[in-house]
């Protein structure tokens, strides 16, 4: 969640504006966040200003709107006058401070937190194997990567591969009863294709989606279950009992 937001604006007001009467209004989702009056000293010069944004008004999808109120004379103004302008620089940016939440290991919101449609950044989702994957493991990973990739669309996606290690971010783990990364060596054996959500052993804010199986064929069946969407995700772990051919 966002705990702090600060809008950093670079702008240049027209030298013909009336000070104080001319101003720049800042809105977030149509709520007024602040007003920047144009002073005499700022006319025709580049100005840097900061506007605090109340994080309580930040939603899943947000819009920052700037409204210029400009005056160049006290009476008989022409609203279409070429002297009425304020140029906002492309160096302007919104600075956000985040606080991670300790999410429960609950698959009912899957594919969150591994993919969130509200996040417009490129998806980076590491794939972790015990060692170099064989052909069936590669097929399972390709199915899951394709499924996530079909959802990211224009955002783009990246699936870095790691052997017998753990990244510091949400990841997909492939493990069988006989072949698994070291951090899962004490995990109990499974008797069916299983999908489990667990916390990173060193960071509870990072989640791991573990695709478990008795063997590689189970991994492939679990991957197909995810792709076909016929798995009822709930709780921290589910089994994939049947998939379409």
Task: Give the ranges of each region predicted by the language model.
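Solvent-exposed alpha-helical segments and adjacent loops
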Residues: 1-245
